[in-house]
Amino acid sequence: MVPETGLAPETGSSGTVAAVVPAAGSGERLAAGIPKAFCEIDGASMLARAVAGLLDSKVVDHVVVAVPADRVDEAKRLLPGQATVVAGGADRTASVRLALAAVPGNPAFVLVHDAARALTPPALIARVVQALRDGHRAVVPALPLHDTVKAVDANGVVLGTPERDGLRAVQTPQGFATDLLLRAYAAGAGTAGFTDDASLVEHVGGQVQVVDGDPLAFKITTQLDLLLAETIVRR
């Protein structure tokens, strides 16, 4: 069944772009005492900075954010008129579904962006959208890995060392043809184990294209990440 959403299951003909930002998580690893998306970086919340980056890219027509139910009014005060605020769900997937349901019209493409990647440059967002317009139906920004990666078992015993050349660290926003994203969410309903939206698309056989990421699109997860973000903003 197609997810409960305001979007039609066909790709929109208008060429417009919507972005959804699931921001209802608690952010326990950041240990800030408030939902992570509402933590401030030099006076502006991560959520406000993430939404501003999307709109400053000039390629996003509307943004829908999903926040904790008790933070909806606060988010509405923080965000501009081009952003719609809805109450999020129990997990990220549920929040994306609720945000999709509130997307107006029938956009051709949908971006899914992490509020915690608050410093993502507008140029990166434009790069993802351009790849969609060039004909790719699923696009993720990513960076090469510089550290050696080990596969380990439950006891910490190394099972192998994957070749770094074929590995990438994936960022957001991840972009999709609207019909493909809806189909992926419909097929993945009730299925656990997907860590990003591109994984859902891969699950239904969709091909995902990688474009160059950006170091500034790092995910703010710990206090050290937050300190780095504040240092960058204040420089």
UniProtKB/Swiss-Prot annotation:
Superkingdom of the organism of origin: Bacteria
GO biological process: isopentenyl diphosphate biosynthetic process, methylerythritol 4-phosphate pathway
Reactions performed catalytically: 2-C-methyl-D-erythritol 4-phosphate + CTP + H(+) = 4-CDP-2-C-methyl-D-erythritol + diphosphate
Keywords, alphabetical: Isoprene biosynthesis, Nucleotidyltransferase, Transferase
Site description Transition state stabilizer, residues in chain: 29, 36
Pathway stated in the Swiss-Prot or TrEMBL entry: Isoprenoid biosynthesis; isopentenyl diphosphate biosynthesis via DXP pathway; isopentenyl diphosphate from 1-deoxy-D-xylulose 5-phosphate: step 2/6
Keyword Cell wall biogenesis/degradation on entry: no
GO molecular function terms attached to this record: 2-C-methyl-D-erythritol 4-phosphate cytidylyltransferase activity
EC number: 2.7.7.60
Record-marked site positions (Positions MEP for the nucleophilic attack): 164, 219
EC category name: transferase
Nucleus as UniProt keyword: no
PANTHER family attached to this UniProt entry: 2-C-METHYL-D-ERYTHRITOL 4-PHOSPHATE CYTIDYLYLTRANSFERASE, CHLOROPLASTIC
NCBIfam families: ispD
Function: Catalyzes the formation of 4-diphosphocytidyl-2-C-methyl-D-erythritol from CTP and 2-C-methyl-D-erythritol 4-phosphate (MEP).
Family to which the UniProt record says this protein belongs: Belongs to the IspD/TarI cytidylyltransferase family. IspD subfamily.
Name of the protein this chain belongs to: 2-C-methyl-D-erythritol 4-phosphate cytidylyltransferase
Species whose genome carries this gene: Mycolicibacterium paratuberculosis (strain ATCC BAA-968 / K-10) (Mycobacterium paratuberculosis)
The gene coding this protein: ispD
